[in-house]
Amino acid sequence: YLMLCSITNGKGQPMKNEERLDMMGKELQDTLAHCLRRGDSYTRYSKSQYLLLLVGTNRENCSLIFERIQKYFSREHKTWSKYLEYAVSSWRTRINSEDNENKWKWGKTWDK
């Protein structure tokens, strides 16, 4: 699966506070380095987003992986958890898809 982790303003919009975005971006990078499993990979997609390749997992476990990321990310700043969002897509579905239908499944942590 591919997961896109995004730092937002807490309301689903892009973070405009550059200083805060830089601080959160560094923390998210440290979090990913600590939380991902052996075999998983990540790269910085933009200043506010990281793309993760999650190997050998299923869609249900993607939410558990995100919860682990979110918990570690907000361990020192409890309110930071609301600034993270994620989307997941099966890379096999994306490669084999013959249509242009949007296959991303959005997960917002406040919808639980």
Task: Write out the residue ranges for each language-model feature.
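Conserved long alpha-helical elements within nucleotide-processing catalytic cores of c-di-GMP signaling
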Residues: 1-4, 8-33, 43-47, 59-67, ...
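Short catalytic/binding micro-motifs of nucleotide second-messenger systems
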Residues: 34-39, 71-81
